[in-house]
UniProtKB/Swiss-Prot annotation:
The keyword ATP-binding does not apply. It is found in: Mitochondrion; Membrane. Its EC number is 3.1.-.-. Belongs to the LCL3 family. It is an enzyme of class 3 (hydrolase). One of its GO terms (cellular component) is mitochondrion. This is Probable endonuclease LCL3. InterPro entries: SNase_OB-fold_sf, Staphylococal_nuclease_OB-fold. The active site is at R111, E119, R159. It is a single-pass membrane protein. One of its GO terms (molecular function) is endonuclease activity. It comes from Lodderomyces elongisporus (strain ATCC 11503 / CBS 2605 / JCM 1781 / NBRC 1676 / NRRL YB-4239). Keywords: Calcium, Endonuclease, Hydrolase, Membrane, Metal-binding, Mitochondrion, Nuclease, Transmembrane, Transmembrane helix. The keyword Protein transport does not apply. The lineage of its organism: Eukaryota, Fungi, Dikarya, Ascomycota, Saccharomycotina.
Length: 238
C-alpha cells in the first residue's frame, strides 16, 4: 500500500494552535512591552520639552543630567544623560558642549522650585541688589556639574519646575535650600504655579533663619524689595 501523503500545511496550521506556541508568543510580546517601558523610563534621552511626557510629571520621574548653562539666578539649562555613569556618560560618552545647535535645541530649561532670586536688569529695568550675586552663586554651585532633577510642573515659559539636587563633598544638596540658607533667594511668593514638593515648611524655616542672620538680600533691611514686589512695580506698573 503506498504511503498516505502528509499535508504539511495542515500540520503547520495545527502547530500554530498548540498551547506552547501561544504561551511563547505571549511571553515574547510581554517581554517586548516590558523592555520598551524600561527603555522609556530609564534610558530614553529627553532632548527637549517636546519629548517630556505627562507621565513623567505625574510620577515625578527623576532626571539625571549635566548643567550646560546658568542664565539667571534661579534657572539653568540641562542636558539629559539617562543612565548616568553606568551608560558611559562622562567617560565613554561626552556632552557635546562644542556644538551650539545641540546646546540650544537639545537641552531642557529648569526652573528651581520653591524659590525666587533677585531680578537682573532686563529691557531697561534696573537690577535688584544681589541679582548678580545670586547668578554667580548658582554658576559656581552648578555649572559643569551633573545633577538630579525631580520635575513637578511645566510653567508658562516651557520650563520644567522642579527640585534640583547635586552631590558635594558633604553629601547630596537641595539647591533651592542652599540658596535660601545663603540669602541669595527667597521663598517663592506667587500664588499660581508655586511648587515645593514636600519641602515648603523646610524652605520657610531656612528663609526665616537667613533673615534673622541678615544674610544676602536680608542684609538690606526694610528697604529690601522682594522679586515679586519688583515685578509688580516694573512689569505691571503698580
Amino acid at each position: 500500500m503506498p504511503p498516505v501523503p502528509v499535508n504539511s500545511t495542515s500540520q503547520d496550521y495545527y502547530g500554530v494552535l498548540e498551547p506552547r506556541v501561544w504561551l511563547l508568543s505571549a511571553g515574547l510580546a510581554a517581554s517586548a512591552i516590558f523592555s520598551y517601558k524600561i527603555y522609556r523610563r530609564y534610558f530614553r534621552r529627553i532632548r527637549s520639552i517636546l519629548d517630556f511626557t505627562p507621565e513623567a510629571l505625574e510620577k515625578n520621574h527623576k532626571l539625571y543630567g549635566y548643567v550646560t548653562r546658568v542664565g539667571d539666578g534661579d534657572n539653568f539649562r540641562f542636558y539629559h544623560t539617562p543612565g548616568g555613569w553606568l551608560l558611559g556618560w562622562g567617560w565613554l560618552r561626552k556632552v557635546p558642549l562644542d556644538n551650539r545647535r545641540i546646546m540650544k535645541d537639545e537641552t531642557l530649561m529648569i526652573r528651581l522650585c520653591g524659590v525666587d532670586a533677585p531680578e537682573r536688569a532686563h529691557f531697561g529695568k534696573p537690577a535688584q541688589p544681589f541679582s548678580e550675586d545670586a547668578l554667580l552663586w548658582l554658576k559656581n554651585y552648578l555649572l559643569g556639574r551633573y545633577v538630579t532633577v525631580t520635575p513637578y510642573s511645566i510653567d508658562q515659559y516651557k520650563r520644567i519646575v522642579g527640585r534640583c539636587q547635586v552631590w558635594k563633598w558633604n553629601g547630596k544638596k537641595d539647591v533651592s535650600a542652599e540658596m535660601l540658607k545663603n540669602g541669595v533667594a527667597i521663598v517663592y511668593e506667587g500664588k499660581v504655579g508655586a511648587e515645593f514638593g514636600d519641602n515648603e515648611d523646610r524652605y520657610r524655616s531656612l528663609e526665616k533663619r537667613a533673615k534673622w542672620l541678615k544674610r544676602g538680600v536680608w542684609s538690606i533691611g526694610k528697604k529690601m524689595m522682594t522679586p515679586g514686589e519688583y515685578k509688580k512695580v516694573y512689569y505691571r506698573g503698580e
